[in-house]
From Swiss-Prot:
GATase cobBQ-type domain location: 248-443
Keyword Oxidoreductase: no
Pfam families: CbiA (PF01656), GATase_3 (PF07685)
Catalytic center residues: C328 (nucleophile), H435
UniProt xrefs under InterPro entries: Class_I_gatase-like, CobQ/CobB/MinD/ParA_Nub-bd_dom, CobQ_GATase1, CobQ_N, CobQ_synth, GATase_3, P-loop_NTPase
Pathway: Cofactor biosynthesis; adenosylcobalamin biosynthesis
Family (UniProt): Belongs to the CobB/CobQ family. CobQ subfamily.
Protein name, entry field: Cobyric acid synthase
Taxonomic classification: Bacteria, Bacillati, Bacillota, Clostridia, Lachnospirales
Entry function: Catalyzes amidations at positions B, D, E, and G on adenosylcobyrinic A,C-diamide. NH(2) groups are provided by glutamine, and one molecule of ATP is hydrogenolyzed for each amidation.
Gene this chain is encoded by: cobQ
MF term (GO), any: catalytic activity
Amino acid sequence: MAKVIMVQGTMSNSGKSFLVAGLCRIFRQDGYRVAPFKSQNMALNSYITDEGLEMGRAQVMQAEAAGIKPMVCMNPILLKPTNNTGSQVIVNGRVLKNMPAREYFAYKKTLIPDIKKAFKKLEEYADIIVIEGAGSPAEINLKENDIVNMGLAHMVDAPVLLVGDIDRGGVFAQLLGTLMLLTDEEKNRVCGLIINKFRGDKTILDPGIQMLEERGRVPVTGVVPYMDVQLEDEDSLTERFDKKTDGLIDIAVIRYPRISNFTDFNVFEQMSEVTVRYVSTVNELRHPDIVFLPGSKNTMGDLLWMRQNGLEAAVKKLSCEIPVFGICGGYQMLGASIADPDGVEEGGYMRGMELLPIDTVLKDSKTRLQTSGEIAHVDGVLSRLSGCHFLGYEIHMGKSAYSTASDEQGACADRKNELNNVISDGRNVYGSYIHGIFDTAEAARVIVDYIADKKGIDVNDSAIVSYKSFKEKQYDRLADTLREYLDMDAVYGMLREAKYD
């Protein structure tokens, strides 16, 4: 029977995902087989496992920290928002259906057997399971039939670490207020409090910590400093989107309302000479060196949004001067047309940006697969991409085909009927269904080198390393920091064997 510990937060973005990843890394370094678990994740970023199953990328990141292969049992329920009131519901890696929030709220209790089955499967492997909650356990409107916070903690008898974010202010009110809103049974599960993202001299917190421990009757297990660790963390998205630093090379990523899988650009963010900006207006777009159109959970809706706010016209104008690269939903937008006969998204027919000679038809069935190989021959300014190795995955609703009898440049040799490699217009515009195509850094290096040559600047090649190697160093940094600022003896003392109600 595996031992368990759970990390819950006072709010979203409190740093739960990082802390779970850090604990996974520490337990792994200490010789344990460890695995992450999150019963239900709501996220725009997802990943495809070796088995072709879909799961949240936060648990993939945590699995990497634990040194194990991502498995869908680490995240049995994934919700991918499709609009402001509903999500695509994915259970055990496969799409169940789209549901409005109210319908899912009533339905979710039927998924408890799936959660228990996934957790028990994980127990077959792990000595320790580190569980991540979602949002706050004190959301009164969500506590009924809870399956992700205290409901899950009760389900597997997990002790809880409660995390508050001091960077946004009011951390003592966050922690004490959350404890006050818990039932006695729930509060008894909370074994330690963590103050996260602190900047400055810890001693100034001493009066507040003393009051918190006296009134909350729960010890403070650690005060963790703000960490500039570059990992694929759902909790850091706001900071990432708002980041506006200046670099020698300026990359603009269109931030449409339903942006997804923007982890494709993480490799560029590690490069000191590169600035990655997420833009949602024409004024923010300015004149970058390259524009990326990322994935989308509502391709037609996001294209309409671009059309209405002027970004489509601005990107089309820039495509005459600089590279424009679309991935997955962004790739579909760049084509001649998008049809949705089955009402997967908006329904009907829509003209695309008409920058690539493809037509897309959206379908209910989702393509989910890992893929690897070499980028096929492409012309244009990024022709040096030809032959670059990639290891990535496809995850999309719909199929694309050439809209003319043009030469199938970029079609993969073993799947010539599907445009699953990289295609171009022969000049500045490129598209691909492949997520993670830049993660090996070879393709990323081609893009950065092209821009550097064009601008007549030098870039530090040593900064363009394997993204995998880069992440390994980040996980070790994260673990080192937590060892220094958390009472790990106390954390080990909290671990207990999972039991089922």
